[in-house]
UniProtKB/Swiss-Prot annotation:
Coiled-coil boundaries: none
Any one GO molecular-function label of the UniProt entry: RNA binding
Origin: domain of life: Eukaryota
BP term (GO), one: positive regulation of transcription of nucleolar large rRNA by RNA polymerase I
Note: Is the likely candidate for being the functional analog of yeast Utp8.
Modified residues (N6-methyllysine): K346
Organism for this UniProt entry: Homo sapiens (Human)
Gene that produces this protein: NOL11
Pfam families for the chain: Nol11_C, NOL11_N
Keywords linked to the UniProt accession: Activator, Methylation, Nucleus, Ribosome biogenesis, rRNA processing, Transcription, Transcription regulation
Name by which UniProt lists this protein: Nucleolar protein 11
């Protein structure tokens, strides 16, 4: 579920925002630092966590910055263009922009684009593109014209696909829109005509895009308040031919078409977009997050001071001008899933769980086209490169780990995994973890004797994996009957299918107590009830206990009481002692905490043997009795099952196996106890309903008394 957290002001300094707002917000080489370029003469470097500026640079009076400053991720330097043609390069140590490196270009620049893993690109207003190094080698080189006359660039985006840069920019001419896609590994420039569809008079207010392996998903927010999607192939069938693309409706009426201050649209991930503008039913501007997969509004935040109609998103932060100050709104989102839509997911997150940012694995491309040059030897003496900092090891630790798991022993692999996890997390951390688990599981299938359970447990505890990413993991653990690993998967994975959950339950109920004693199981969800069992037995002998306000001895249910009047000597012991050993109880608690959907779970519960169902019901009934002993109706322990979970599973087991369990003699007393349990609950709710009715009558009488409008005069005689 998407969530917008509490906003905060990045700086109280009023920025020089023009009529159209800021020029831009760009990420620096530090994940917590951002470059903010106003519409005047200044570039400010902010640190978001400290909410303060780290540096500020301005061009001379009379000069004006014409495109946002960006960071060259290869060198750690900053690049900006002022007066359309003058390019400046500096770093944190520089103070005066007038004294840093300067290059005057032969054509006007529209935008400088920079992402991690490749050198910056310079997009000129005439549609030509150059790599920064090739451009600086000859600043006065001739720049060709790509777009036609009166065609104006409206928006651009820079991606890295398969380690190769891909640039897309949108142009407009006389109400017609065109998309240009530049592939730098093959030097292919493809032009597309964007067909507006039925409403040809609509104007596109904002663009955003995301990319996968085959398509660029171009989303546009039109003047009719709707969001449309156009799929642009990364590898066109006929690059030389001008092709037409039709847009499809993605979301309808997300903002008002009569927005005064403009609207903005940005893609947050594959399933969510953020929209800035005035909703149809409100006059004030709002920031809203929409799920494009389910076409639902996830969350919204009102912005009473108004905005400039600009929105930027990096990592987990949304940037915008709220009033006259730059505002940051942290954004969190869980991945949309079928389990979240149909099933019951965990509502609490373990304290040790942390969120891993989803970064693309940017890698430096080899031999990109369009004049990309090897930057090891720069032709510019004035630029101070930080070669010592930017040098990379010949073999990254991630590749060393992947090569180790394919051939080395289990102990050596465990040591290498521990070393890798001790390193600082890199943007490709989750990718390496997934590849490592996949490699280990493939080797497990090829070599039956190979089973690095300790490595697998360390990788699961990184909170990066899920069942859908590595389904073979639990399959192998089920074959090995590794209950410790299965328990950990149940605690960490939110998307386990119901069939796998039932397979785990079968093993947890069938494994012998002797085998469990030799197994290390997480016991934090289990409380040692044997401590209080002796005290409870003495209390039952001395006094009569009322459970939930109901005395079982006073309620005579005919045949049930006739059976229960003949109490065996060990009945008290059965009710106060846990029917399973503590380690089995911990495993069963993991089942109770797991996510499920009743529709998909019930058919698989019917396959569990009746004696195991009876044992599970006895344990659940024992947990219910322990809950009833407390006024809060909760169990002791760090992460125990809740009363709702206990009752839900009792109902599920009886629904699936009642006809089988009722035929078992050893289950007779258990079913009678469950019957009395339900009867006592009905009695409690009946009494509560009576109390509620009484309170309503008293409230009604009180209202009638107050509404009579009568008064009385009392005369006191004094003698």
């Amino acid at each position: 579920m998407a969530a917008l957290e509490e906003e905060f002001t990045l700086s109280s300094v009023v920025l020089s925002a023009g009529p159209e707002g800021l020029l831009g917000v760009e990420q620096s080489d530090k994940t917590d630092q951002f470059l903010v370029t106003d519409s005047g003469r200044t570039v400010i470097l902010y640190k978001v966590s400290d909410q303060k500026p780290l540096g500020s640079w301005s061009v001379k009076q009379g000069q004006i910055i014409t495109c946002p400053a960006v960071c060259n991720f290869q060198t750690g330097e900053y690049v900006v263009v002022h007066d359309n043609k003058v390019l400046r390069i500096w770093n944190n140590e520089d103070v005066n922009l007038d004294k840093v490196f300067k290059a005057t270009l032969s054509a006007e620049v529209y935008r400088i684009l920079s992402v991690q893993g490749t050198e910056p690109l310079v997009l000129f207003k005439e549609g030509a593109v150059r790599g920064l190094e090739a451009l600086l080698a000859d600043p006065q080189q001739k720049i060709e014209t790509v777009i036609s006359d009166e065609e104006v660039i409206k928006w651009t985006k820079f991606f890295v696909v398969f380690r190769h840069p891909v640039l897309i920019f949108i142009t407009e001419k006389h109400g017609n829109y065109f998309a240009y896609v530049q592939m730098f590994n093959s030097r292919i420039l493809t032009k597309y005509t964007l067909l507006l569809g039925q409403d040809e008079n609509s104007v596109i207010k904002s663009f955003t895009a995301s990319v996968d392996r085959k398509f660029i998903s171009l989303m546009s927010l039109s003047s009719d308040g709707c969001i449309y999607e156009t799929l642009i192939p990364i590898r066109p069938a006929d690059p030389e031919k001008n092709q037409s693309l039709v847009k499809s409706l993605l979301l309808k009426a997300v903002v008002s078409g009569n927005a005064r201050n403009g609207v903005a649209l940005t893609a947050l991930d594959q399933d969510h977009v953020a929209v800035l503008g005035s909703p149809l039913a409100a006059s004030k501007e709002c920031l809203s997050v929409w799920n494009i997969k389910f076409q639902t509004l996830q969350t919204s935040k009102e912005l009473p001071q108004g905005t400039s109609g600009q929105l930027w998103y990096y990592g987990e932060h949304l940037f915008m001008l709220h009033g006259k100050s730059l505002t940051v709104i942290p954004y969190k989102c869980e991945v949309s899933s079928l389990a979240g839509a149909l099933g019951k997911l965990k509502h609490s997150q373990d304290p040790g769980t942390h969120v891993v940012s989803h970064f693309v694995n940017w890698e430096t491309p080899q031999g990109c086209g369009l004049g990309f040059q090897n930057s090891e030897q720069s032709r510019r003496i004035l630029r101070r490169r930080k070669i010592e900092v930017s040098l990379q090891p010949e073999v990254p630790p991630s590749k060393q780990l992947l090569s180790t798991i394919m051939k080395d022993s289990e102990k050596h692999i465990e040591v290498e995994v521990r070393k890798f996890l001790a390193l600082k997390q890199t943007p490709d951390f989750h990718t390496v973890i997934g590849d490592t688990v996949t490699g280990l599981l493939e080797r497990c299938k090829a070599e039956p004797s190979f089973y690095p359970r300790n490595c697998l447990m360390q990788l699961i505890q990184t909170h990066v994996l899920s069942y859908s990413l590595c389904p073979d993991l639990m399959e192998i653990a089920l074959k090995k009957k590794d209950v410790q690993l299965l328990q950990l998967c149940l605690q960490q994975f939110p998307d386990i299918p119901e069939s796998v959950t039932c397979a785990c339950l079968k093993i947890f109920l069938s494994i012998g107590d002797d085998s469990l004693q030799e197994t290390d199981v997480n016991m934090e969800s289990v409380f040692d009830y044997s401590i209080n069992s002796v005290h409870d037995e003495k209390m039952e002998e001395q006094t009569e206990i009322l459970q939930n306000g109901f005395n079982p001895e006073e309620d005579k249910c005919n045949n049930c009481d006739q059976e229960l009047n003949k109490k065996p000597q060990d009945e008290t012991k059965e009710s106060t002692s846990c029917p399973v050993v503590q380690k089995r109880a911990a495993l069963l608690n993991a089942i109770l905490h797991s996510a499920y959907s009743e529709t998909f779970l019930l058919p698989h519960l019917k396959d569990i043997p009746a004696q195991h169902i009876t044992l599970f019901l006895k344990y659940l009934y024992f947990l219910y009795l322990k809950c009833s002993e407390n006024a809060t109706m909760t169990l002791p322990g760090i992460h125990p099952p809740t009363l709702n979970q206990i009752m839900d599973w009792i109902c599920l087991l009886l629904d699936a196996n009642f006809t089988v369990v009722v035929m078992m003699p050893e289950a007779k007393r258990l079913l009678i106890n469950l019957y009395k349990l339900v009867k006592s609950q009905i009695s409690v709710y009946s009494e509560l309903n009576k109390i509620e009715v009484s309170f309503r009558e008293l409230q009604k009488l009180n209202q009638e008394k107050n509404n009579r409008g009568l008064y009385s005069i009392e005369v006191l005689e004094l003698f």
